Amino acid sequence: MFFNSLLTNFAALEVGQHLYWQIGNIRLHGQVFLTSWILLGALLVFISFGTKKMENDPKGLQNLLEFLWDYIRDLARTQIGEKVYRDWMPFIGTLFLFVFVSNWGGALIPWRLIKLPSGELGAPTADINTTIALALLVSLSYFYAGLSNKGWRYFEYYVHPTPIMLPFKILEDFTKPLSLSFRLFGNILADELVVGVLVFLVPLILPIPVMFLGLFTSAIQALIFATLAAYYIGEAVEEHH
């Protein structure tokens, strides 16, 4: 009884105000959906323009997109392995681009100029619900990768190299999504808060270098998230001897 009450109170905790959409019994964070759709739409437009007229000698947007493609391919090949990396390139690439665009969108776009009935817009990755959803998606993906490539032999991983490792391997399955989600959430939220406070206190000069540092941090966090996702998938499909 006490435990259920504690969980209920913990789930009710909020930081700031939020815009909610009520769909039946489901309560959604409206501002997260709005910013996600806007950023995904901008990303799709960017990609469609870059691939509209493909040339043998790439330049402009096509050159940038081919660079990203090569980078994601090399990342997936290095972390997952030569055998199955092609199957996971779209997933790793989508993760990287969504996190990257979400992080940079929060740093570059003045969302607070858009007034809402309640709450305010910001980077989707500055919301813990988004980062937890992404981390759980990664967890489901590496479970699927292991089972689809090895079948029931995948569970041998939990007792390799010795059965003593079983509780630690199970605990690891819980800590992986926690570390993924809280690392991304904490870094992006902290960056938004620091820039917001500096803009309020010293609105002219000081926030600019901090914003550039935030852009660098945002790109690094997207790279870390995609790299760890690929590493976990590679770990799941790796053959243990």
UniProtKB/Swiss-Prot annotation:
InterPro entries, per database record: ATP_syn_F0_a_bact/chloroplast, ATP_synth_F0_asu, ATP_synth_F0_asu_AS, F0_ATP_A_sf
Range of residues in the leader sequence: none
Classification via PANTHER family: ATP SYNTHASE SUBUNIT A, CHLOROPLASTIC (PTHR42823:SF3)
NCBIfam families (alphabetical): ATP_synt_6_or_A
One Pfam family named in its UniProt record: ATP-synt_A
Protein's name in the database: ATP synthase subunit a
Compartments where found: Cellular thylakoid membrane
Gene3D superfamilies referenced in this protein's UniProt entry, alphabetically: ATP synthase, F0 complex, subunit A (1.20.120.220)
Residues passing through the membrane, by range: 30-50, 91-111, 128-148, 193-213, 214-234
Topology of the protein relative to the lipid bilayer: Multi-pass membrane protein
Entry similarity comment: Belongs to the ATPase A chain family.
One GO CC annotation: plasma membrane-derived thylakoid membrane
Assembly mode: F-type ATPases have 2 components, CF(1) - the catalytic core - and CF(0) - the membrane proton channel. CF(1) has five subunits: alpha(3), beta(3), gamma(1), delta(1), epsilon(1). CF(0) has four main subunits: a, b, b' and c.
Annotated keywords: ATP synthesis, CF(0), Hydrogen ion transport, Ion transport, Membrane, Thylakoid, Transmembrane, Transmembrane helix, Transport
HAMAP family in the cross-refs: ATP_synth_a_bact
CDD domains: ATP-synt_Fo_a_6
Lineage: Bacteria, Bacillati, Cyanobacteriota, Cyanophyceae, Synechococcales
Function: Key component of the proton channel; it plays a direct role in the translocation of protons across the membrane.
Species annotation: Prochlorococcus marinus (strain AS9601)
Keyword field contains GTP-binding: no
GO MF annotations, alphabetized: proton-transporting ATP synthase activity, rotational mechanism
